[in-house]
Amino acid sequence: MTLTSAHPKSKLMKRFAALGPYLREGQCQNDHFFFDCLAVCINVKLAPEKREFWGWWIELEPSAGRFTYVYQLGLFNKEGNWNAEKISDPEVQDKLESTLRSFHLRLEEMLASIDMKLEPAADFNDQPVKLSA
């Protein structure tokens, strides 16, 4: 599948995967790309399959010359689902913001290398973390 005349989906998937462990290929459908980060484990004493994490997820969709994004901060529960939640611990919030900004910068640089821009989606008004100037 070709998303634009110059960028087939297979090549984009390889580039996205090279950004690190963030790409969730199983949740990428057609022209929709899903990335997430399990940044802070809530209880490391639990068995791995029962652990929950604070983290973030970001979804991308292509349009003419750019990708638009929406993202959320929240809890990745033991069932393997994301739930948007307000983070009350300032240290956890800082960690999530730091990892999200770092990923956003690398994603933006990668897209710029193929002459694509990265912009918030038109309907994404409530951005909990400012990602770019």
From Swiss-Prot:
User: Member of which family?
Assistant: Belongs to the Crl family.
What name does the UniProt record give this protein? Sigma factor-binding protein Crl
Any one annotated GO CC term = cytoplasm
Q: For this UniProt entry, which segments traverse the membrane?
A: none
Pfam families per the record?
Crl
Could you list this entry's UniProt keywords, alphabetically sorted.
Activator, Cytoplasm, Transcription, Transcription regulation
* UniProt-annotated location(s): Cytoplasm
Concerning InterPro entries, the annotation shows: Tscrpt_reg_Crl (IPR009986), Tscrpt_reg_Crl_sf (IPR038208)
What does the function comment of this entry state?
Binds to the sigma-S subunit of RNA polymerase, activating expression of sigma-S-regulated genes. Stimulates RNA polymerase holoenzyme formation and may bind to several other sigma factors, such as sigma-70 and sigma-32.
Q: Which intervals of the chain are annotated as region Essential for activity?
A: 99-122
Instruction: List GO BP terms, alphabetically.
Output: positive regulation of DNA-templated transcription
Is-annotated flag, keyword Transcription? yes
**Gene name for this UniProt entry:** crl
NCBIfam families in UniProt: PRK10984.1 (NF008217)
The main place the protein resides is cytoplasm
- The source's superkingdom equals Bacteria
